[in-house]
Amino acid sequence: MTSRHLAITMGDPAGIGPEIIVKACLGLKGRIATGDLRLLIIGSGAALDGAKAALGTDVAIPQVSADDREWPNLCYLQADAEGDPIKPGVLSADGGRFAYKAIEQGVRLTQAGRTAAIVTAPLNKEALNKAGYHFPGHTEMLAHLTGVRGSVMLLAHGNMRVSHVSTHVALEDVPKRLTPERLRMVIDLTNDALRRLGIAKPKIAVAALNPHAGEGGLFGRQDIDVSAPTIAKAVADGLDVIGPVPGDTIFVKLRAGQFDAAVAMYHDQGHIPVKLLGFQVDPATGRWQELSGVNITLGLPIIRTSVDHGTAFDIAGKGIANEHSLIEAIDYAERLAAGASASKS
């Protein structure tokens, strides 16, 4: 546990963020009541009220001010944004504006030490752009807000932990993103995150970019010329790193526990195995039955975790959204915050 609040940003209030936040609060009410867990929700109070009505609950989430010296264990801070009433499931610039302002306030509070970490519910990239905020996603926005040039996305579900060399770029641009400097940064940040999670001597595997790790150069030389020497240097520096491991087998080995995390070269290479295990769909309706997994941003001066799914406008306001990913994100934020505190003591 951490003695400070976790900042929970609502994301787009027209999405399922308000609902999964209320559901998570209900599921964690025992810990909240004892003070073992403290949550500060940042977003739209009206959207919170709407979610409570949809779920038929009157759970108390009092409003507070950022300047209050003390906050109750569970409370909310109104995002510093204005706009028309936001309707569940309706994409709008106002929804994007609320999402951005909530994140901005959460970052500011966490940088100031008022909150221990920031946990983000999903935003909608189109709504964000309509509001004038042109970021590919949360990760890039947080890097901008904290003044960081390089950050790393790590997805986690159970023991399936996968960090990424590149994410929101065209596949044709991925080889250009694989440089010795970038790969070493990803390895180092992944190693540090695993140590914060309580793994004393992390073992990391690096995925190959090309089929069969390039097959001796027949299918490309990036694995031979870039990845292999970078891995060798990391090993020489005392890290436990192996690779390049062919992409068609690395995640089978990760799931079996042969190593603690994998480094993927690009978005879909890393996202597919995590979501294959963490997501389930109802074959009859096509609706999601289970949404588990956490998105962690490494390399920031603050701790940030997130759900690993989108705003789901199609089911927003219906009381059927799954909160498991948010609860996982809260758990990871606590563990990382505790690990950060331990490393400073």
Swiss-Prot record:
It catalyses: 4-O-phospho-D-threonate + NAD(+) = dihydroxyacetone phosphate + CO2 + NADH. Binds 1 divalent metal cation per subunit. Its cofactor is a divalent metal cation. A divalent metal cation binds at H168, H212, H267. Substrate binds at H138, T139, K275, N295, R304. Its EC number is 1.1.1.408. The keyword Metal-binding applies. This is Putative D-threonate 4-phosphate dehydrogenase. It comes from Bradyrhizobium diazoefficiens (strain JCM 10833 / BCRC 13528 / IAM 13628 / NBRC 14792 / USDA 110).
